[in-house]
Amino acid sequence: MRNLRNIRFGRCPRQHVTAACWDPETDEVLCTAGPTEESSSIELLRIKGDQDISVDLVASWDAPSPTPDLLVDKVVSLQYLSGSATTCIVLEGGDIYTVQEDKFSGGDPHIEIVGSIDAGISTARWSPDEELLVVVTKANTVILMGATFDPVAEVTMTAEDLKASKHVSVGWGKKETQFQGRGAKAMRDPTIPEKVDQGLPSAHEDGSTTISWRGDGAYVAINSVQEGERRVIRVYSREGELDSASEPVDGLEGTLSWRPSGNLMAGIQRLPDRIDVAFFERNGLRHGQFTLRSPSGPVTAHERIRLEWNSDSTVLAVIYKDLIQLWTMGNYHWYLKQEIPIQPDSTCLAWHPEKALRFAAASTTNVLVGEYIFYTARGSCQPPNDNGAVAVIDGETIKLTPFRTANIPPPMSMFEISVSSAAVDIAFGPNNTTFAVLHHKGIDFYEWPMKNGRSVKPELSHKNAFLELETPEYGVPLRITAVGDEFHLFAQEELGFVHSSRKAGDDTVPHMQEPDDVLLATTTYQDGSSLEAYGQNSAGDLLKITTERGLQLLPVRFHTHMPWFEISKVDGEIVAFGLSRNGHIYANERLLAKNCTSFVLTPNHLIFTTNNHFVKFVHLSANVEELEVPVDDPEKDERCRSVERGSRLVTAIPANMSIILQMPRGNLETVFPRAMVVAGIRSLIDEKNYARAFSYCRTQRVDMNILYDHQPEQFLANVGLFLDQIPDVTFIDLFLSSLR
C-alpha cells in the first residue's frame, strides 16, 4: 500500500557524460565525461549537492584509441573504491586507470594505468565488497582480478558451457509429442508450456555483454552472446568456476541485473507484441516475468532497455532512452510507482550503495540526482471523517480503498480511477471528501462523497492541465499537498525549486514562484474546522504553508531532516513527530524509540510499529517530556500488542477503533487494539452513546464496568437514556451481572 514520494531532486547540465557512480563517504556523485569523436580527453567530475548542484573537476587526461578498429574509446566501468579512496576507470580499448585524489592538501590527483588488456574489454564490474574486478574481454575470456589488480582466475566462454546446467527436456511442448485430436486443448497439462524456446535472437540484438554480481559477492552472472548458438547467462563463483548456464529464451536481450537479496536475476525478453522483464534463478531456469507498460507510449518502440536493482532489493529501475521507471512488487503484482523523464540519450543509472532510494542518472546532456521514500497516501484520521482512505499508485491507475467500508487486499481495490499520464503524487482534501492526483500532464480533482455512511465511487470534478510554457522539458512535478480547499504543487524547473497553488474549477494560469525555503517533505493536519499544511527543510526546520503569507517558521523543529513526519495539536500546542531512516522516532527533538518501522497519528494516540514486532500506543500530551512509551510487555500493558513479523501500519480508523496492518508479502490485517478500543468506548460514553459503547464492550470483551466507572455521575443521571438505548432484557442482565 506504499507509494514512492520524492524528497530530493536536482539537475546539472553537463555534456557527454558517459558513466556515474557514488562516493558513499561524502554522498557525492563521480562521473566521467568523454571521450568523444571531437576529443579523446576524459574528465573525472565530482557532483555535489542535492537541489543546488555544483560540479568540480577532479582530473582530466588524454585517452586516445589504442587500436584503429576502435574509433573512439569508451568508459565501460566506473567505480569508487572506498577502502583505498581511489576511483577505478576501465576503458573499452583495454586500459584500466586509477585516480587517487588528494583531499587533504588539495594537490593534483595521481593518475595511473594499473593494467592493460590487448584484446580490448567488452565490460567490467567490481564486486560489492570491492575485492574482485571481473573483466570480460573481446576475445570471450573472463578475467577475475584482485583489489591489487593481480589475476585470480581466467576462463574462456565456449559453447561447451551451455551444457553446464543439464536442463532436462523430454520433448514436452513439441508438436510431435502433443495429442492433436478432438479435445486436445482441454486435455493439455497446464504446467507444460505450449512452446519451447530455442534461444532465437531479439530483433534489437546489439551483441552487448553485461555483468551483475549477487549482493553477497559470492557469485557473478555474465549475459553474453555465444556465437553460433544463442544469448546465454553464465554464473561463476568467486574462484572463476562455472556454476550454471541459462536455458534458451527467445528474444533475450543484453541487460542483466541480479537482485541483491540473491533470489532472482532480471533480464529483458522482447516478444513480437510486448516486452517482458524475465526472471532467472541462479541455476539458469526461468522464474516468472511481468510485462512492461508505460502511460507515455508503447514501450516496444524503445530499442535498448536496461535494468538496475536498488541496494535493498525493493525497487527495480527500468531505464529507457528518455525515461526511468521505478517498479515495486507486492502480493505478486508489479506496480509502476514513478516515471521520471530524462534528456535523451540516457547513458547510465547508479543507485546509492547505502541509501537505498537515492540514485544518479546521466544522459548526454545532464546529470540527474534524486531520492525517494516509501510513504502511504492516506486520508485524515480525524473522526467522524476517518473513512480509512488509502490510495495506491500503479502507473496511470490509482487504486482507492476506504477501509472503514471494506478491507480489500492489494493488488485489488474498491475503486480504480485513471489519469492521462503516470501519476506522481496524491493529496486528500478536507474531511476526505476531495482529493487531487498530480501527474505529468496536470492535476485531476475528484469529489469523493459518502452515501449512507459508505464511500461511493469518486467523481472527476475538474482537470487542470499544465501548459507547455509551464512544464518545459526540464520541468518535473514532484509533490502535491492540500492547504484548506486549495492544493499546492511543488516542482523542479530550470530556475530551481518552485511551487504554486491550484484550486478545482480555476483555469487561470498560476504563477510558479520560488519559495523562501526548499521543502523536502510535506504533511497535513486536520482538526474540526480547518486543514493545515506543513513542510520541512533539509535542516529539520518546520514551516507552515499558507496561501496568503507563504511559509511561516514554527517554534518547534527536529534536530535534523526527518523523511517522514506528522503534526499534532494538543491543547493548542504543536507537537511534531518524525521518523528517521535508521528507525529513530522523535517528538520535536526528544527521542522516543530507536526501533520504529512505521507510525500513524490519531487525535488521541501516536501509534507505531517496531522491529521487535510490536505495535505501541503513546497517549498524546502537549509536553513532549510527558509522553510515555510502553515497554515490550504486551501481557501486562494494553498499550503494547504483538503483531506479525515485519508488519507496517497502513492507516488507523478511530471511529471503528481499528488499525490496518500490512505484512511483508503484501496482505492486510485489521486489528482492534485494546488501547484504541478502550479509548473509543470512553469517547462514546462521553457522547452518551451507550448503545455503541455496550456493543463494543460485548464484541471486544471489555469489562462492562467501564460504562459506569468512566463517568459515574453522568451514568446515574442518565439511567433512563441507558435503558432506552439498550432495550433488550438479556443485555441488561449481562450488564448488571458484570458490575462489581
Task: Name each model feature, range by range.
Residues 1-647, 669-680, 684, 706:
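WD40-like beta-propeller blades
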Residues 218, 222-225, 270, 622, ...:
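Alpha-helical repeat scaffolds in large eukaryotic proteins
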Residues 642-644, 650-654, 659-671:
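Canonical SH2 domain fold
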Residues 656-665, 717-740:
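A cross-kingdom feature marking charged/low-complexity
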Residues 695-726:
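Short, charge-rich amphipathic alpha-helical segments embedded
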